[in-house]
Regions:
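Extracytoplasmic "Venus flytrap"
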Residues: 32-40, 44-67, 89-96, 118-119, ...
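Segments of small-molecule ligand-sensing domains
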Residues: 318-330, 339-398
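Extracytoplasmic ligand/sensor domains, especially the bilobed periplasmic-binding protein
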Residues: 110-215, 265-291
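Beta-alpha junction/loop-to-helix N-cap segments that form part of ligand/metal-binding clefts
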Residues: 26-34, 58-64, 76-149, 160, ...
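Hydrophobic alpha-helical segments within soluble ligand-binding/sensing domains
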Residues: 98, 159-183, 224-226, 249, ...
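Signal peptide-proximal N-terminal region
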Residues: 41-46, 64-86, 206-209
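Extracellular/periplasmic periplasmic-binding protein-like sensory domains
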Residues: 256-332, 405-408
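C-terminal motif of bacterial Sec signal peptides marking the signal peptidase cleavage site
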Residues: 18-21
Length: 410
């Protein structure tokens, strides 16, 4: 499994090199007199870039969850007396706009660090520039495996969520146990995100009797995936792996039902939202879906009396009332922000390098993550903060966790 990961990481690195080239710049983002910009005795300025508009605008609620958590920390006095100012800009899920935002945040806003910038292609477009400026690009909102593997060339970049190769391994392990001769049809987004998960899955099933028998890709600019779904449904697949973002995830669920395609349907974590995907598609059409989870589902009655989820919902209501408390993306943002605060608390001095040292050496529990899942890093070579997930199945009106937490190896 480890050799398969190494091979795929080499391919992924080659893929993103072209994206990264457009983000290169020689401007120096360092402050004067040896001090780092964006941090004072009473404030810390962070920057982020998100798709507030465009085909992935459903992810806007990630920023809302993060803002709510930072506001709740500020209300209690901040981090060591420093209030957090989180400046978030819209990139419409377009890499060139992400590049513009990164330059603005670093050169004009003078942020201390970039936090949770969203999207595989967008982060790939800016990471050469950001690392050249020696500005932390931490806890990016993308599960591309590259963020945790290329620490030598990009020491200021880290992921947060379980990477897509880990997720693909979990699906492969599930099928190997539950459907060991599965014939799989795959719908995937035609970019680094989709290819990372798809190729990770192909590597993970090597040596098994599981076979990928059909593949169809879509562009983020496509209006629908109807034609792709028709082609996949005409294959001899008995399993459907749906690698998509929320808009297209919902479309695929509807299309499968319309086509009468009754196969095991696995939908990737980023499109598994009951609120944003399953409800628009129809809960009746979503029965039996398989996915993964690593944080608590705010819509599940399982966590109705959970202290961490109560704190989350109260904080969201107080500081981001426009956000939906049952949106899992809000929990994602809240949890990532909680991790960021722990990293800031762990700094031995108020510098960017001290932040990275803290980020690379963590062992902490974030209360909104699932029991048994922690944020752990163990040195400068460790770029995978969360390395565990749990299989879940949609039954009735909610996701139901299955089995035990599955931990990956890197």
């Amino acid at each position: 499994m480890r050799n398969a990961r190494i091979v795929w990481l080499a391919l992924l690195a080659a893929f993103v090199m072209g994206l990264a080239a457009c983000g290169r710049d020689d401007d120096d983002g360092a402050g004067e007199g040896g001090s780092d910009p964006g941090i004072t005795k009473d404030s810390i300025k962070l920057g982020g870039s998100y798709p507030f508009s465009g085909p992935a605008s459903a992810y806007r609620s990630i920023e809302q969850g993060a803002q709510a958590y930072f506001a709740s920390v500020n209300a209690e006095g901040g981090v060591d007396g420093r209030k957090i100012d989180f400046v978030a800009l819209d990139d419409a899920y377009e890499p060139p706009k992400a590049v513009q935002n990164a330059r603005r945040l670093i050169q004009e806003e003078k942020v201390f660090a970039l936090f949770n910038t969203l999207g595989t292609a967008n982060n790939a477009a800016i990471w050469d520039y950001v690392n050249k400026q020696k500005v932390p690009q931490v806890y990016v909102a993308t599960g591309a495996s590259l963020w945790g593997a290329d620490v030598d060339a990009h020491p200021y970049t880290t992921g947060w969520q379980p990477d897509y190769v880990t997720e693909s391994q979990v699906y492969a392990d599930y099928l190997d146990k539950e459907k060991p001769q599965a014939k799989v049809a795959v719908l995937y987004q035609n970019d680094a995100f989709g290819e990372d998960l798809l190729n990770g899955f192909k590597k993970a099933i090597e040596g098994t009797d599981i076979e990928v028998v059909a593949e169809e890709s879509y562009e983020v600019t496509d209006p629908t995936v109807s034609s792709q779904m028709s082609k996949l449904a005409s294959s001899d697949a008995d399993t459907f792996l749906n690698i998509s973002t929320p808009k297209f995830g919902a479309q695929a669920i509807v299309a499968a039902d319309k086509l009468g395609w009754k196969v095991l349907h696995i939908i990737n974590n980023v499109a598994a939202s009951k609120l944003l995907v399953l409800q628009p598609a129809g809960l009746d059409k979503s029965q039996g879906l398989i996915s993964t989870a690593y944080f608590k589902d705010p819509a599940s009655p399982e966590w109705a009396n959970d202290d961490a989820m109560t704190e989350f919902k109260d904080g969201l209501k107080r500081f981001e009332p426009r956000a939906n408390p049952e949106d899992p993306n809000c929990v994602f943002g809240w949890s990532a922000a909680a991790t960021m605060v722990e990293a800031l608390k762990g700094m031995k001095e108020p510098t960017r390098d001290a932040l990275m040292d803290s980020v690379r050496n963590m062992d902490t529990e974030i209360p909104t993550l699932l029991p048994g899942i922690k944020v752990t890093t163990s040195g400068s070579e460790d770029g995978y903060p969360i390395e565990a997930m749990q299989i879940q199945r949609f039954e009735g009106e909610n996701w139901k966790l299955l089995g035990d937490v599955i931990k990956a190896e890197h």
